[in-house]
Amino acid sequence: MGLPWYRVHTVLINDPGRLIAAHLMHTALVAGWAGSMALYELATFDPSDPVLNPMWRQGMFVLPFMARLGVTGSWSGWSITGETGIDPGFWSFEGVALAHIVLSGLLFLAACWHWVYWDLELFRDPRTGEPALDLPKMFGIHLFLAGLLCFGFGAFHLTGLFGPGMWVSDPYGLTGSVQPVAPEWGPDGFNPYNPGGVVAHHIAAGIVGIIAGLFHILVRPPQRLYKALRMGNIETVLSSSIAAVFFAAFVVAGTMWYGSATTPIELFGPTRYQWDSSYFQQEINRRVQASLASGATLEEAWSAIPEKLAFYDYIGNNPAKGGLFRTGPMNKGDGIAQAWKGHAVFRNKEGEELFVRRMPAFFESFPVILTDKNGVVKADIPFRRAESKYSFEQQGVTVSFYGGELNGQTFTDPPTVKSYARKAIFGEIFEFDTETLNSDGIFRTSPRGWFTFAHAVFALLFFFGHIWHGARTLFRDVFSGIDPELSPEQVEWGFYQKVGDVTTRRKEAV
């Protein structure tokens, strides 16, 4: 076809056979990418430490989506929850990856078939012999099938009736595992953090889709509505489909960034709002106070804090800390976490406990400031030492550790105390291996940040695509300016012969 590069899809407008082929090829590419990406991630994934080196720290993107649907084991015998020597059966990470690659190959062959055999009897009206598609009925068929799939996913896969269930965890991301989930039909089903609502809504939406699909298959639209919404134009289908996709992209960008039952922090990392609101810090303090109230010492109380919970309370795991143009996983930034040093408690020479002011999410650098329980500044690391009144040396600041590697140890020399204070502005203090990955010390975002950014951007682009194609189909007669005297084949295909089309006029050799 003699068309400019930005008009490539024009060839599909009046060609349902090759439109099917294009969609099959696109799905083949998506499935092939998913399977290939899964194999690549499996080749680079280190499952040895699910607490301090989880998949989201390693930049895994497709593995968390498999895990939340119930795939947690590998044919190599490991599980993302830390078990070894397991037998996951066929539906392991590798099994799902291979299934996608095989599906991709079959879809590729189907696309080739439909590209060659594009002029099927199926696409012609049996009464007139003219090319015709019953788009409202096709909409009903697609809606019915989508509803069936949606209902089946909710009623069987998620409930465990015929499937594994879904990833369910506690509010602090400590005890997650794949479990069958019962539907929640009450008001609590609208809580975005309640997995029962996911099940109930898939079942309900599936039933609605099945009923609506049957309605559109059996009932014809009124002629006035058919003409007003251009229901006979394939570009109407494109426009409304893009609308559905961009709406879904906006929704999932929101559920990923703000958090929900479908984006557990064990698989995708914490949200930025959990750092902003001191979510994990408050839970840690609550547990410590409860232990102290029951008679435990400070060392015992802090030693009872799970390392996993302490690791969440570290700014390097905040997805808002990574710039959009800093490529690579989180581990390429601050390094691979090795151990929790313990909770640092600072005191001045009077024995008064001091609290390090933590860095807000969008700061790249932040001063080291220590305050008392009332928020009054008591110590800092000054920029101009000559004018200093609150230096660590002047205030006699010391640091004691409770829990972790340094449990029970106290440091009094100012250089050491200051080094720990600088780390304490980032939350709990951890030891990192920066050698293995040649980590550069610049924070990266988690897959949560990448997913949100990508889907928000594509949703915006697709929104404009919806407006563009919607306008084209509503005002087609104005935009096209097609001369009504042109022959039908010239309108459909231009002046260029379509390969295999015997009806197109062409010059014969003299």
UniProtKB/Swiss-Prot annotation:
Residues 38-94, 158-196, 255-450 are lumenal. Binds multiple chlorophylls. PSII binds additional chlorophylls, carotenoids and specific lipids. GO terms for cellular component: photosystem II; plasma membrane-derived thylakoid membrane. Signal peptide: none annotated. The chain crosses the membrane at residues 17-37, 95-116, 135-157, 197-218, 234-254, 451-473. One of its GO terms (biological process) is photosynthetic electron transport in photosystem II. Gene3D superfamilies: Photosystem II CP47 reaction center protein. Keywords: Chlorophyll, Chromophore, Membrane, Photosynthesis, Photosystem II, Thylakoid, Transmembrane, Transmembrane helix. GO terms for molecular function: chlorophyll binding; electron transporter, transferring electrons within the cyclic electron transport pathway of photosynthesis activity. It is found in: Cellular thylakoid membrane. Residues 2-16, 117-134, 219-233, 474-510 are cytoplasmic. PSII is composed of 1 copy each of membrane proteins PsbA, PsbB, PsbC, PsbD, PsbE, PsbF, PsbH, PsbI, PsbJ, PsbK, PsbL, PsbM, PsbT, PsbX, PsbY, PsbZ, Psb30/Ycf12, peripheral proteins PsbO, CyanoQ (PsbQ), PsbU, PsbV and a large number of cofactors. It forms dimeric complexes. Part of a photosystem II (PSII) assembly intermediate complex PSII-I; crystallized from a strain deleted of psbJ, it forms monomeric PSII before addition of the oxygen evolving complex. PSII-I includes 3 assembly factors not found in mature PSII (Psb27, Psb28 and Psb34). Belongs to the PsbB/PsbC family. PsbB subfamily. This is Photosystem II CP47 reaction center protein. It comes from Thermosynechococcus vestitus (strain NIES-2133 / IAM M-273 / BP-1).
